[in-house]
Amino acid sequence: MGTTGTNDGATTPPANTSTPAVDIDVRDLGTVDYEDTWHLQANLAAQRAEEKIPDTILLLQHPPTYTAGKRTQDSDRPTNGLPVVDVDRGGRITWHGPGQLVAYPIIKLADPVDVVDYVRRLEQALIQTCEDLGLHGTGRVEGRSGVWLPAGVINGELKPARKIAAIGIRVTRGVTMHGVALNCDNTMEYYDHIVPCGLADAGVTTLTEELGRDVSVSDAYSSLAHNLVDALNGDLPVHS
């Protein structure tokens, strides 16, 4: 995904990415069933399209759940027999569960709708959250969604590029659904049974794994909430 850059690598966020520019309602849902939350999102998105509610961000965790986006291949699906929820977001298969902080922004994008700009803002919020928590060097990988750590030698071991946060969205009637998932201190066990996001040549990691100390969902919560609001309001510059 491309952006129009300035000389320092930052972009000037357009003023009309979402409306209103302020007044985003952030809701903490705790741990909630995936399908129940999916239905809640659809209900809120319909209300947002009719201007009945303000822009809203849902912050939560899910019980262990595999979800498959519209591009999921049969070969991506789990080998451990666990059920999969087929959903209407983009992307392929992923896992949600305890220790992973999930955010679902229900945002009315301004016309003309710019989905690339919206995704860039989500990525920037995640990158800044990692920085806030002491994890430096996260960024984007061309042609792949989400937030990544680059391949490299760490403690004498060659590690592949590793995804620390996933993004999958849907836009209907100009309103966003689904969103982002930041791996904090969740288990990696469930990823062993799928091809996460359809990427067989890449790894998955957590804040806890990379920082060598426990980083819980509660540790990341305030930072991610703040950075999402700032990114969506245009107060957090988007860097290429």
UniProtKB/Swiss-Prot annotation:
GO terms for biological process: protein modification process. GO terms for molecular function: lipoyl(octanoyl) transferase activity. PROSITE patterns: BPL_LPL_CATALYTIC, LIPB. The record marks 163 as: Lowers pKa of active site Cys. Catalyzes the transfer of endogenously produced octanoic acid from octanoyl-acyl-carrier-protein onto the lipoyl domains of lipoate-dependent enzymes. Lipoyl-ACP can also act as a substrate although octanoyl-ACP is likely to be the physiological substrate. In the reaction, the free carboxyl group of octanoic acid is attached via an amide linkage to the epsilon-amino group of a specific lysine residue of lipoyl domains of lipoate-dependent enzymes. This is Octanoyltransferase. It comes from Corynebacterium jeikeium (strain K411). The gene is lipB.
